Amino acid sequence: MINLRKTHPLMKIINHSFIDLPTPSNISAWWNFGSLLGFSLMIQILTGLFLAMHYIPDTTVAFSSVAHICRDVNYGWLIRNLHANGASMFFACLFLHIGRGIYYGSYLYKETWNIGVILLLTVMATASMGYVLPWGQMSFWGATVITNLLSAIPYIGTTLVEWIWGGFSVDKATLTRFFALHFILPFMIAALTIVHLLFLHETGSNNPLGINPNSDKIPFHPYYTTKDALGLMFLLTILLLLSLLSPDTLSDPDNFSQANPLKHSPHIKPEWYFLFAYAILRSIPNKLGGVLALLASILILLIMPLLHTSKQRSLMFRPISQTLFWLLVTNLLVLTWIGAQPVEQPYIMIGQVMSITYFLLIIVFMPLANSFENHMLKP
């Protein structure tokens, strides 16, 4: 009997990607986050689609339309909470996924890694625009401050900002275009994810040992489909607990007031997942310098394959590099805390020290540790 999943043109693609895919037998739970990101994206697209059916992208009624969704639409409050907290879960999985890639040397699959960085930037752009849509106080001032950063670009800055705004300030035109872009970008993310997987399946998955796993591979199904299903249950449990019991924990209280261009928010800060980058931006007194540091903090991921000089791929057997990796994680957590604090001493100084340390760890200390560990391997 002909096995349809191995012969049908469409099912054959799915079979080679998710069923008969040869997978290293020793990949740990850290490899679960790729599938969790896929599920998170599906949750975001579905909840976002239902929200878009009731949301009105107009400055006069946007805030009221969100209130209407929560009060009058059947389970609208749940859809809205799942969408808002789903974004937090998405970014949590994203950061853990990138961290896993750095720890186990997955960045040496250059095409997969570079597409991943492009995906990160696209997801960040989507989330930034989504934050503007409820048209609360923090939405408005966040949009004003972040878009205004582009005015730091020499010669064309001011023109570029006004072009993005569609006027001389953040207004109706800005909200409408942000809604349109926020709606279309997740589908671009889905397309990029397919390209990401395409490149990954060209090489096969990395593994914790960082060695060639071709001698010991098992089919993806049923082993890793079961493992991913367990991860998904954990993700959904946390998301539902957050959305049902404490939906506003990660929100800013300022965003419960309607946007008022005449009243300035005392402390402008983005959602928690952007705080580390915001802290780096604020730590430099110069506007253009801050924007460049902000960009560099993300784009530095692109040069990671070039900075890898170790004879070993993974950090599993490299204690010095492991220590530096965990210092980098701690550094990012401190930057996240600093980003939420007001601009005053001692936070300014801590932010500046941590920003410098962040770049030094990646560009100087990690490559030095690589060389030192190579030297230690010599008999």
Swiss-Prot record:
Topological category with respect to the lipid bilayer: Multi-pass membrane protein
Record text on cofactor binding: Binds 2 heme b groups non-covalently.
Cofactor(s) required for function per UniProt: heme b
CDD domains reported in the protein's UniProt record: cytochrome_b_C, Cytochrome_b_N
Cellular component aspect of the GO annotation: mitochondrial inner membrane; respiratory chain complex III
Keywords, comma-separated and alphabetical: Electron transport, Heme, Iron, Membrane, Metal-binding, Mitochondrion, Mitochondrion inner membrane, Respiratory chain, Transmembrane, Transmembrane helix, Transport, Ubiquinone
Binding site for a ubiquinone: H201
TM spans (from-to): 33-53, 77-98, 113-133, 178-198, 226-246, 288-308, 320-340, 347-367
GO MF assignments: metal ion binding; ubiquinol-cytochrome-c reductase activity
Keyword Repeat found: no
GO biological process, one term: mitochondrial electron transport, ubiquinol to cytochrome c
Predominant cellular place of this UniProt entry's protein: mitochondrion
One Pfam family of this chain: Cytochrome_B
Binding site for heme b b562: H83, H182
PROSITE patterns, alphabetized: CYTB_CTER, CYTB_NTER
UniProt subcellular location: Mitochondrion inner membrane
Binding, heme b b566: H97, H196
Subunit structure: The cytochrome bc1 complex contains 11 subunits: 3 respiratory subunits (MT-CYB, CYC1 and UQCRFS1), 2 core proteins (UQCRC1 and UQCRC2) and 6 low-molecular weight proteins (UQCRH/QCR6, UQCRB/QCR7, UQCRQ/QCR8, UQCR10/QCR9, UQCR11/QCR10 and a cleavage product of UQCRFS1). This cytochrome bc1 complex then forms a dimer.
Family statement: Belongs to the cytochrome b family.
Task performed by this protein: Component of the ubiquinol-cytochrome c reductase complex (complex III or cytochrome b-c1 complex) that is part of the mitochondrial respiratory chain. The b-c1 complex mediates electron transfer from ubiquinol to cytochrome c. Contributes to the generation of a proton gradient across the mitochondrial membrane that is then used for ATP synthesis.
Other facts: Heme 1 (or BL or b562) is low-potential and absorbs at about 562 nm, and heme 2 (or BH or b566) is high-potential and absorbs at about 566 nm.
Protein name: Cytochrome b
Organism: Pseudochirops cupreus
